[in-house]
């Protein structure tokens, strides 16, 4: 007997590297290349540190209200967490407490099975088709819950509002969690379905389209009943997860719709241009509705490509994992950054062909 | 069958009220009456919001390093969490995973049993003596872990380093978690015992003595092995719990030792003066080593006293709970605030005596 016998053993999630090179092109964690709204800068400048002696609002009251108004929902339908990873984590803990396995695509955000192992939630992976498309029919079976990223990561591919509605219609006895971390880059949000389904929970984040990965804010939207349960679990986990400054920064980021739309549009335009250039170079590229592309080249091994890009100080993401080990995920940066990537790949492919 | 059947049912912790009255004297959540170090203000002023587009360090690397240096420990002995509530929560999940009940005092931080219920950890409450003192012998029995707040809350009373060492000596096969949230106000930290015991975990916070309740930073110190396990669980729960600004603010608060010592001393002096005045008024007051006092008046019902204080806009804390329902916990504010409380109580007692 030793204290080590009482440990909860887990295999943790490994986040994308945050390297300390200064002259790199960092395209590995889907960060936004543009700064957050200038309203955020203003809030920070105006913040008085003496306020920090007091505890923040336990449930980020004003931020929830701002988000509810923005999305035409009630405040009690909005949950704020410490990044969407925490929102997902607490959602798994709250909603997936049944005996039956929860369902998720076999290729998706790799944190989902890790939450399941942390909380000992049985789960079943449903294979995507060979082209990474999702068939809703495979979710018409008994389950203890469903989690689907829409658009999906790392494929970038989206399913339609109608498909989500079909899943909901066939699964009214378990929570259907739709992770919309990347929804603002071209997918269709299922928030309107909250009117019809009290078992739908939609998770979004400030980290991607709002350029606020550094401040850790995530959201869950759902029925007042579901959100109340999520708050009960949150209040059994941590009283005050969102600091005062983060609450104010979150509010500020929703006051400048013009800037938001402009920076999102820019990323979408860059993505489409980048994608076309990649196709010209012989890459296979999925139909991404996100701020990244998922790519494969029939003539280059992805592990090798990851390495040569890294040596050229271009950092992308690669998984040594069945079905996707031949693929790379590349975040959309600025036009300039993506041009550098294209120029590098052109050169690399030219030299490679010469060497045949 | 319905989605509600899959819910994880809990009775959440209820934090002290954060009322929105502006002219109140808020002595209910043990906040520091003094502002944080001016270095904190400077860090906020200098912060560039464009940095927020990037994810923060997953493990608050520089802040851990600063804390390790301050306490003469190694960086791998330091864990940073989103407030000490999160640190405690993740510690319970990580370390208390055995079959045997964990032990805790019957009167202590009311979050402990709530974590146990959240994670389904069996626990046993060990009664304090009638004078709220803790007998170490009652912790010499089989257990799956031990958690003790030192100084204790809400009693404010501390145990000695030697007593903690005795507990550790008799419990080398389970984690002994010492919650030192209030340690800087007069208790003796058990950090030096980390040299001898790899099963000791010490939790501290930035919320009390560092005046940073609003920024949500908590710490666990332990053996490199214990801390690595805690990080594994944290990395299965949430990748990036501490935002970039909070990491910098935490670092800044440790650069101004003079200010820190001065504000802590001031609170201790105010506490002792306040305590003496209360005793003169007939109150029974425990020997507090914290920034609050725990008080009882033989002639006044605590529920009534709580109410009349509230009506006078003086907000303190009361629990409707066995053994302490006759007691109030009063945070130490400024001298001026505590004088107002004393004046009010003098007046109230005088009028009460008249009415006999």
Swiss-Prot record, chains A, B:
For biological process, the GO terms are:
L-histidine biosynthetic process
GO MF entry, a single one = histidinol-phosphate transaminase activity
Keywords in alphabetical order, please: Amino-acid biosynthesis, Aminotransferase, Histidine biosynthesis, Pyridoxal phosphate, Transferase
**EC code:** 2.6.1.9
Pathway membership of this protein? Amino-acid biosynthesis; L-histidine biosynthesis; L-histidine from 5-phospho-alpha-D-ribose 1-diphosphate: step 7/9
At which residues is N6-(pyridoxal phosphate)lysine found?
A: 208
- Tell me which stretches of the chain form a coiled coil: none
Which sequence ranges are marked TM in the entry?
none
Q: Which cofactor does it need?
A: pyridoxal 5'-phosphate
CDD domains tied to this protein: AAT_like
Q: Which reaction does it catalyse?
A: L-histidinol phosphate + 2-oxoglutarate = 3-(imidazol-4-yl)-2-oxopropyl phosphate + L-glutamate
InterPro entries given for it? Aminotrans_II_pyridoxalP_BS, Aminotransferase_I/II_large, HisP_aminotrans, HistidinolP_aminotransfase, PyrdxlP-dep_Trfase, PyrdxlP-dep_Trfase_major, PyrdxlP-dep_Trfase_small
Record Gene3D superfamilies: Aspartate Aminotransferase, domain 1, Type I PLP-dependent aspartate aminotransferase-like (Major domain)
**Family, similarity comment:** Belongs to the class-II pyridoxal-phosphate-dependent aminotransferase family. Histidinol-phosphate aminotransferase subfamily.
What quaternary arrangement does the UniProt entry report? Homodimer.
Protein name per UniProt = Histidinol-phosphate aminotransferase
